C-alpha cells in the first residue's frame, strides 16, 4: 500500500490517491468524514477551521460502497479557496497584479520551511513554500488513515489516541484502554482527566494572549494486533522503524518513542523487559507492556503504544527576528493565520499516520487481493500464537 497527496493550503483542493487497498472493503464517504471532523476540532485552533468543512468525495476505486482493488482517489475541497482564487489560481498574473495582492512573502518564519525551501527551489516568493509545507496537507493524510482504520476494524484491530501533555501540563497516568477509549473525545483537549483539561485550556488561552504557541506529547494505541507483523531480518521492515518515520513525517513532530520510551534508559533490564506468559485462550502474552507491544521490530500481540512529540507551531503573532530575503535587512517574521495550539488535532493526525503504517505492513505480510483472503490469514496467525 502507498499513497500520494497533492494540493496547496489555499489551493482549490487536496487530492490523495491510495494504491493497494484490498477489494471488497465496505466504505463510504460518511465513514471517512467522521474521522475528518475529529481533526478539525481541538482547543486552540485558528479561524481557518471555522471556514473549512472537510467533507471528502471518493472519485475512484469504490463502487456501490465497496472497494474494487484499484486505486482509491479522494478529494478534499478547500472552501477558503474562494478568498484566494486570484492569488492561488493556476493562470499567470503580472508582477503588478501580484504586488497589489500584497500576499508575497519575503520574511521567513523561524522554525518553518520558508527559508530553506526558498533556497532549495529558488522561490523568491516564499508563499510557494509555505502553501505546500502547511499542515493543511494532513487533512489528506487523515483521509488515508480513515480508510486504513476501517480496514483494521474489520480485522478486529482498533486504533485510538489521546493527549498526554500540552505546554508542560501532563495527564500521563497509565490508564487502562477502556478508560482511554471512553474519554478520547470527551473534551476538546483530548486528555482523560477533566481537571487537567481545565489547566491546559488556561495555558492555551495565555499563550494566545501572549502571541505565542504551545506543543505537547500525544499517544497512539493499537489494540489486538496479530503477532509477528514487521521483521527482525531487515532494518527497513521493522514495524517500529516504519511507525517512527510515519510519526516524525507529520508537520512539527520532533520525536517518537514506544511504550515507556526514554524512561527505559533510567531502569535496569529486569524492570523493562516484559515476562512471557501463556494461557489456552490467548496463547503467548506478556505480564507487562513496558516495550509498547514491539519486540525485535515486530508486533508481539500486546497493545502497540506510540508516543509522539510535537513542537510549538512556528507561526507566532508576536513574531521572532528574521531577515527580508530581498533587502537582507533584519525584520520580524511574517505573520500567517495559525493556531495557538494544534496538539489535540495533531493527536488525530498521528493516530491516522500510525494506522497507515500498520495497515501497509499488514498488507505486505499477508496476501491481500481481497478482504476475505486477508481476514482468513490474520485469523490463522492469531491461531498460530496459541498453537505454536
Swiss-Prot record:
InterPro entries documented for this protein: Chorismate_synth, Chorismate_synth_AroC_sf, Chorismate_synthase_CS
GO molecular function: chorismate synthase activity; FMN binding
Originating organism: Staphylococcus carnosus (strain TM300)
Assembly with partners or alone: Homotetramer.
Pathway: Metabolic intermediate biosynthesis; chorismate biosynthesis; chorismate from D-erythrose 4-phosphate and phosphoenolpyruvate: step 7/7
Broadest EC class assigned to this enzyme: lyase
Reactions accelerated catalytically: 5-O-(1-carboxyvinyl)-3-phosphoshikimate = chorismate + phosphate
Family: Belongs to the chorismate synthase family.
Gene Ontology terms: biological process: amino acid biosynthetic process; aromatic amino acid family biosynthetic process; chorismate biosynthetic process
Keywords, in A-Z order: Amino-acid biosynthesis, Aromatic amino acid biosynthesis, FAD, Flavoprotein, FMN, Lyase, NADP
Binding, FMN: 132-134, 251-252, 296, 311-315, 337
GO cellular component, one term: cytosol
Role, per record: This reaction introduces a second double bond into the aromatic ring system.
Protein name: Chorismate synthase
Key word Transcription regulation present: no
Domain of life: Bacteria
Cofactor annotation remark: Reduced FMN (FMNH(2)).
Matching CDD domains: Chorismate_synthase (cd07304)
Positions with a binding annotation for NADP(+): 39, 45
EC number assigned by the record: 4.2.3.5
Cofactor requirements of the protein: FMNH2
